[in-house]
Amino acid sequence: NKIIFLEKRHFNNSLLALPVTRNAIKIPSGLISGQQIESGLNHYFWPAATITDFSELPIPFLCLATDVVTSKKVVFTGGYLPDAIRASIAIPSVFTPVRTDTAVLVDGGVVRNYAATELREMGADIVIGSYVSFRGYKEKDLGTAYGILKQIGFLSSLADYEEQKRLTDIMIEPELGEVNTLSFNNIDSIIARGYREALKYRDVFEKLADSLDSYGPREPVIPLHDVMYYIFDTIRVTGNELISDEQIIGVLNVRPGENVDRDLLEERIELLYG
């Protein structure tokens, strides 16, 4: 993202690019800039693009990020949904952080990896959760410097998790073995392990469903309708340092007042990004 789109074709064979500033190599803030992730989030959450209050979604939603400037958690209950999710999954050193005018946001798990408190404050009567993060090493596993450093790095998060767990009615903790946060190629296996663990709670869920039925029929959750197109009032370029705003808008070729569908916008952004 430090190369203008006109020159990116010259870098297609590079495995890694490190910018040089003032005769020094600058280490990036993350191995993955996240453009494809952002594109995917924008694609799947297209129907919710104009919903800025997450309580108005078919199922009310919130997510957490961590501001590394203040070391405090940031609770997203509104805004642009893909941006909120992108910030909440920005694993430090793996994905680049999300920067705002005053904050540098990374994965919320740095401070709070399980948001039972926020769900209760949101009005949840029953909290059902699944925890798949690091649970801490036993004494016998703390025989290496790496293990000790990892344990120290998670001390705050682990202590907070125990507090959040006490606020949970049903907690599902699949046994993941060697699977970790970066096991992107083990999706099917991870889902299968979660499913097997959830089956152990089948009787609990059935009793819970029966107790809820005693309150009468529940309103069905109506999914968002897919949106054919949006009409932009204005188009503004921010954070640009490499080429003129006019060039960017020219390549984007999307004008205020025109109907813009998802495929067209994704195609133009891909072209612009190079």
Residue ranges and their predicted role:
Residues N1-E270, G274:
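Patatin-like phospholipase
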